[in-house]
Amino acid sequence: MSIDFSPERWEQVKQNAARWWRGELDRPLIQLRVTGRDPGRPEPKVPAHGFTAFYDLSLPAEEVVDRWDYDLSKIYFMGDAFPCIWPNFGAGVVAAFLGCELHRDERTCWFKPTRDLELSELQFRFDPDNVWFRRVKDVCRAAIDRWQGQVQVSMTDLGGILDILSSFRPSEKLLLDLVDHPEEVKRRSWEIHTLWWTYFDEIDRILRTKNPGYTAWTPIFSRTPYYMLQCDFCYMI
């Protein structure tokens, strides 16, 4: 067996989501996913992980996607639910794209700077060969190639601008920077903002070739691009 979701179901999802975005749907979008369906094939040896970053970089992206395919094949999609996967490399993975170290344990991922630099010493640039950026693209490309539009592949959690900056200036330092160097914080934030869009566009260039539409870390479907504004850092200001 394969993933149980027909083109007709997809069309229904698209129509209901479009009406919801326009404020024309007289109910909330309700997604129900029930496990227990027979996947019709043996379970892959690759384990299931909540964080895609938990998989060793030596594991081919195609094997990660095969694990996802198996898991999706066990699900009954009800209501407004649809098959969707989220390449989860940690909240604010742009920090890793820009040079932070990505750390992992058995529960989560986080980012640390490789050097303790002052705000004025930070330099951000787009690096197409960054190991984590390449991994995200490889996984997304493998997913798109495997499913050819049957499964919605979400945008990874790029993060909020100040959240990304706080990975380079661990939060207590960035709090002081807001007082001591507010203009420098703004300047660095706009630099990250520009790069954020570069990363979004680069990943989207892969996803939009076959994806039914757009989702992010929330599986809310949209025919047009969207992403949530977010700033976890702001609660400490």
Question: Which residues make up each language-model segment?
Answer:
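A contiguous, low-structure linker/loop signature
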Residues: 84-122
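Short, solvent-exposed coil/turn linker segments
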Residues: 49, 53, 112-120, 237
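Trp/Phe/Arg-rich N-terminal binding region typifying the photolyase-homology
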Residues: 53-62
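Active-site loop segments of alpha/beta catalytic cores
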Residues: 1-50, 66, 71, 78-86, ...
